[in-house]
């Protein structure tokens, strides 16, 4: 009887794990079926158009705009990977490290590179697997532990022990984890449109609306098919994400120009360029929830109210995981791509946060 009591907790844990993974893969199958129907519909309308992809051999001129900074590379010790980044501002100034989301790369921070270089060494990174940064082949190389170690090693390689850390979307997830695991490395934390990781995992299990909005997390668990679907019709999905009325950048004057959009398509149309970014998501269900989750770094959370991928209620709940100073600002009529959609307002809010004194909660 005593042995049975000892085994019962392990048995319950095993059953919960089996149930969880059964639900994950069932939803993966459902998402894959929906995308397969989309593919068949596209083929029915015109197979030639579905598989059309013009060659893009040369990067658009905007990617070499000198006003954005200097293209640099650093090889880090732990993994041996070479990382690409664009840096603006003088060496020796305090470091501001910018982590992009999906499907983005360093260029999504173009407004911030210009804005903050007067007082900071601003570094906009291509994350592991993105852009000109090395992309390991195996999905195991994209676990959250690896991504966290990347940022720690990059700081060391750049000669800094701490930074102002800003992350958007998936980069926001990594920024939260850095602040949790290495609080001494983060002077101030700024996250754009991504809640605390524990809030995200708890909320998605209880709210079907967020489960639907995050369906791509599940679709990305499937090998090769997501990359294929992302690239058909000359990257129609990518264009839709940034330009459509439902998901795109809506503010007039900040919408992506033809050249901006071509820059995104150029980067993700390179051979194998989609597998690295999607591999980030292929490990997420084995890494969450977190064992340690409290944030002690002064934190600013910025949120676009019209985010098509994240429920705004998650932003409000995030404050329970921040022990120290926490400020939340929700911008009305702003999309998920907040730092590109409302750059003037976002930059002003960041400046205010950086310059104000942040005291611990009583």
UniProtKB/Swiss-Prot annotation:
Name the domain of life this protein comes from: Eukaryota
- Identify the catalytic residues: 169 (nucleophile), 281 (proton donor), 336 (proton acceptor)
Q: Which Pfam families match?
A: Abhydrolase_1
Q: Where are the transmembrane segments?
A: 17-37
Q: What is its membrane topology?
A: Single-pass type II membrane protein
Domain AB hydrolase-1, residue spans: 94-211
> What GO cellular component is one of the record's annotations?
membrane
Location of this chain's protein in the cell: Membrane
Question: What GO molecular-function term can you cite, just one?
Answer: hydrolase activity
Q: Tell me which InterPro entries the record gives.
A: AB_hydrolase_1, AB_hydrolase_fold, Epox_hydrolase-like
Q: What EC number(s) would the UniProt record show?
A: 3.3.-.-
Q: Does the keyword NAD apply?
A: no
Mind listing the UniProt keywords for this protein, alphabetically?
Answer: Hydrolase, Membrane, Signal-anchor, Transmembrane, Transmembrane helix
Q: Which family does it belong to?
A: Belongs to the AB hydrolase superfamily. Epoxide hydrolase family.
Q: Provide the protein name.
A: Epoxide hydrolase 4
Organism name:
Homo sapiens (Human)
């Amino acid at each position: 009887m005593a042995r049975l009591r000892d085994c019962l907790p392990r048995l319950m844990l095993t059953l919960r794990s089996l149930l969880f993974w059964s639900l994950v893969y069932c939803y993966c199958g459902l998402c894959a079926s929906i995308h397969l129907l989309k593919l068949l519909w596209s083929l029915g309308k015109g197979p030639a158009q579905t598989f059309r992809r013009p060659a893009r051999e040369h990067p658009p001129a905007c990617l070499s705009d000198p006003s954005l900074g200097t293209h640099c590379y650093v090889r880090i010790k732990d993994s041996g990977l070479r990382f690409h980044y664009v840096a603006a501002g003088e060496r020796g100034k305090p470091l501001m490290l910018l982590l992009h989301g999906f499907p983005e790369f360093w260029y999504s921070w173009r407004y911030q590179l210009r804005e903050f270089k007067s007082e900071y060494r601003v570094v906009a990174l291509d994350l592991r697997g993105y852009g000109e940064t090395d992309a390991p082949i195996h999905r195991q190389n994209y676990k959250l532990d690896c991504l966290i170690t990347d940022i720690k090693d990059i700081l060391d390689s750049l000669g800094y022990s701490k930074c102002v850390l800003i992350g958007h979307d998936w980069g926001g997830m990594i920024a939260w984890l850095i602040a949790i695991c290495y609080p001494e490395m983060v002077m101030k934390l700024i996250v754009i449109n991504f809640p605390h990781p524990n809030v995200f995992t708890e909320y998605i299990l209880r709210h079907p609306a967020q489960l639907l909005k995050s369906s791509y997390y599940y679709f990305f668990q499937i090998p090769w098919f997501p990359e294929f679907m992302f690239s058909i019709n000359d990257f129609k999905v990518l264009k839709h994400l940034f330009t459509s009325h439902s998901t795109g950048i809506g503010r007039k004057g900040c919408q992506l120009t033809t050249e901006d959009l071509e820059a995104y398509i150029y980067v993700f149309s390179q051979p194998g360029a989609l597998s690295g970014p999607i591999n980030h998501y292929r490990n997420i269900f084995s890494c969450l929830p977190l064992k340690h989750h409290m944030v002690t770094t002064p934190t600013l959370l910025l949120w676009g109210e019209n985010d098509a991928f994240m429920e705004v209620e998650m932003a409000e709940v995030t404050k329970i995981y921040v022990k120290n100073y926490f400020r939340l600002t929700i911008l009305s009529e702003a999309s998920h791509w907040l730092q590109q959609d409302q750059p003037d307002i976002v930059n002003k809010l960041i400046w205010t946060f950086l310059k104000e004194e942040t005291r611990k909660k009583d």
